[in-house]
Amino acid sequence: MKQNITTPALQNIKITDPLFGHYADVVAEKLLPYQWEVLNDRIPGVEKSHSVENLRIAAGESSAQRQGAVFCDTDAYKWLEAVAYCLASGRGKQYEQTADELIDLIAKAQEPDGYLDTYYTL
C-alpha cells in the first residue's frame, strides 16, 4: 500500500502549545540576537567564533588572518537557518535585514564556482 505524504509549508504550521510556543518565542527574542553577537565576537568572556570575520576576510572586506575552528563557517549558516524558520513562522522580522546582509557577504565570499569554506580557501 502506497501513501502520498505531503509536507506542509512552514507558513502553514502554527505552534499553539504553550510550552513549545514559549521556546519558539525565546529563540526569536533572545537566542537570535545573542547568537548574532557571538558570531561577531562581541560578547566579553565568550570564546570568539570568528565566523562572520572569516567570511569578511574571504569577501575581501578584511585583511585579518583567518582564525577559529575548521567548521566555524557553519555557525553563520545555522543562524541564517534559524532566522528563516522564525520568519516563516511570523517571528523574527527584525532580523531580516541582518540576514540579507549576511547572505550578501556569503555570496561575495564564495569562489567563482560557488564553493565556500574559509578554512580551505583562505
Regions from the PLM with identified roles:
Residues 1-122:
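Glycan-recognition and catalytic cores of secretory/periplasmic carbohydrate-active enzymes
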